[in-house]
Amino acid sequence: MRMGKIAVGYGFLLLLVFQLGVRASTLFNKYNVQELSSLKDLLERLEEKLSPGEESDVYAGSEDLVNDPEEDADLILDNVRKQAEKEFYKPAGFRDENLQRGRLRSIATSARSMNGCFGNRIERIGSWSSLGCNNSRFGSKKRIF
């Protein structure tokens, strides 16, 4: 009986909180609508002030630009040089980390390339067979002491 009263009380509080939340959000939404309408008015006034003749004045300097292929090539070379300098002048920690990654990758790939197998299986005590080996190349069974 006591649990029922507690559940009803919490349910009532939950309903009250939801109702207050809805009221707060509608007030908030009205405020946003008013703000949006004032921003639209400002935007329209700005567009009216800016005439089509003034728009061409803003971009008048763009006609003076000429695309020279030699200048473009020089810019590309400069960017490549800057990138190379950034790589060269990186802190030693970054370079060492990349070297370590490369060494680990080479170890992992070299073991696979030398052996050609990816695992072994014990058939019985003292007898091993290669699982992923090409049988014609490595034979069907390998004996390990």
UniProtKB/Swiss-Prot annotation:
PROSITE patterns: NATRIURETIC_PEPTIDE. The keyword Secreted applies. It is found in: Secreted. Heart atrium and ventricle, and to a very low extent in brain. It comes from the Eukaryota. Disulfide bonds join 117-133. GO terms for cellular component: cytoplasm; extracellular space. One of its GO terms (biological process) is cGMP biosynthetic process. One of its GO terms (molecular function) is hormone activity. It holds the Pfam family ANP. Keywords: Disulfide bond, Hormone, Secreted, Signal, Vasoactive. The keyword Metal-binding does not apply. Residues 1-24 form the signal peptide. Belongs to the natriuretic peptide family. Exhibits natriuretic and vasodepressor activity. This is Ventricular natriuretic peptide. It comes from Acipenser transmontanus.
